[in-house]
């Protein structure tokens, strides 16, 4: 729905699936060689889903999952299963990511938003000072840990706020969503103070 919204500029590149998929924004075709590098270490959605089948307490998310397997799971349910799930994923050569006390992702090894964004920046020869990352849940943590200048928008997951508290390049906004990003643009001085794009319109 967002990509078809004429009011939203279409991105040149899209990193999605928690970093497991990277495509051209206008054609939605895989961006090579980055995508092939990720795919080479992914055993396949069906293989991973079958390995996770014994964990009946996990509820599969109804989203496209070509390069990840994603589930819903609350903390109390996950606690006694976590070690077994991590062992099963490790046997497949996969990583486990849990965020927002709800989202459980089985991912290709060494794959996350931060690593994929860093690889994309190198491919495009983009200097880090031209990059601003934003997020609100723990699955965004890797972008901040990768050293990019970033903002945790208002109402972020407490675990993300805590994990980024000591990161020099990360700023914590008070406004949620896009408002927090605008605050960060102003904080980091990415636009001139009188730029009309800097201030959100008031109702």
Could you tell me what each predicted segment is?
Residues 7-10, 18, 92, 146-147, ...:
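Short, structured coil segments at secondary-structure junctions
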Residues 3-7, 27-28, 83, 145-146, ...:
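Short amphipathic alpha-helical segments
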Residues 1, 78-79, 158-161:
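Short, charged/polar "capping" segments at the starts of alpha-helices
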Residues 107, 114-203:
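Mg2+-dependent phosphoryl-transfer enzymes with acidic/Ser/Thr/Gly-rich catalytic loops
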Residues 45-146:
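Conserved acidic, metal-coordinating active-site core of Asp-based
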Residues 17, 99-101, 175:
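Conserved beta-strand termini and adjacent loop/short-helix elements that scaffold enzyme active sites
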């Amino acid at each position: 729905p967002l990509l078809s919204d004429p009011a939203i500029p279409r991105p040149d590149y899209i990193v999605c699936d928690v970093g497991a998929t990277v495509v051209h924004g206008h054609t939605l075709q895989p961006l090579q060689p980055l995508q092939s590098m990720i795919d080479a270490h992914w055993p396949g959605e069906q293989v991973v889903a079958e390995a996770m089948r014994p964990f009946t307490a996990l509820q599969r998310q109804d989203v496209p999952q070509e390069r990840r397997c994603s589930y819903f799971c609350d903390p109390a349910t996950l606690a006694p299963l976590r070690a077994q799930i991590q062992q099963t994923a490790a046997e497949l050569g996969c990583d486990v990511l849990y965020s927002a006390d709800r989202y459980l992702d089985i991912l290709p090894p060494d794959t996350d938003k931060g690593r994929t964004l860093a690889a994309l920046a190198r491919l495009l020869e983009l200097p880090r000072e031209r990059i601003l990352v934003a997020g609100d849940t723990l699955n965004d943590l890797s972008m901040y840990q990768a050293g990019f200048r970033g903002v945790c928008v208002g109402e972020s997951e407490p675990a993300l706020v805590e994990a980024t508290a000591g990161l020099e390049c990360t700023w914590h906004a008070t406004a949620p969503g896009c408002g927090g990003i605008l605050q960060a643009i102003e904080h980091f001085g990415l636009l001139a103070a009188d730029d009309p794009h800097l201030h959100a319109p008031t109702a």
